[in-house]
Curated annotation (Swiss-Prot):
Pfam families: Ribosomal_L23. The gene is rpl23. This is Large ribosomal subunit protein uL23c. It is found in: Plastid, Chloroplast. Binds to 23S rRNA. It comes from Bigelowiella natans. GO terms for cellular component: chloroplast; ribonucleoprotein complex; ribosome. InterPro entries: Nucleotide-bd_a/b_plait_sf, Ribosomal_uL23-like, Ribosomal_uL23/eL15/eS24_sf. The lineage of its organism: Eukaryota, Sar, Rhizaria, Cercozoa, Chlorarachniophyceae. It comes from the Eukaryota. One of its GO terms (molecular function) is structural constituent of ribosome.
Length: 87
């Protein structure tokens, strides 16, 4: 189950959204919103209020002359005062 969550995305926009209890992750592209919500609630013992997903389109890399595969990004809204702790 942990291998379905790939890593947390840390950009300027995602760091600013941490103040409003929104976390951004890259997840496996086969997961749907209900599965993502269940995984995060079980792994981190938090209440997920909202799940927003976004699939990035595959893009052409001019350096390697091939397409990069698409990925799925998820933005989770959790209860205020709760934190996702990474060990």
């Amino acid at each position: 189950m942990i291998n379905l969550l790939q890593f947390q995305i840390l950009t300027e926009k995602s760091i600013n959204s941490l103040e409003s209890n929104k976390y951004t992750f890259k997840v496996d592209k086969r997961l749907n919103k209900t599965q993502i919500k269940e995984i995060f609630e079980q792994l981190f013992n938090i209440k997920v209020l909202n799940v927003n997903t976004c699939r990035s389109p595959k893009s052409f890399s001019r350096a390697s002359k091939r397409y990069k595969s698409f990925y799925k990004k998820v933005i989770l809204t959790v209860e205020s005062g709760k934190l996702i702790q990474f060990v």
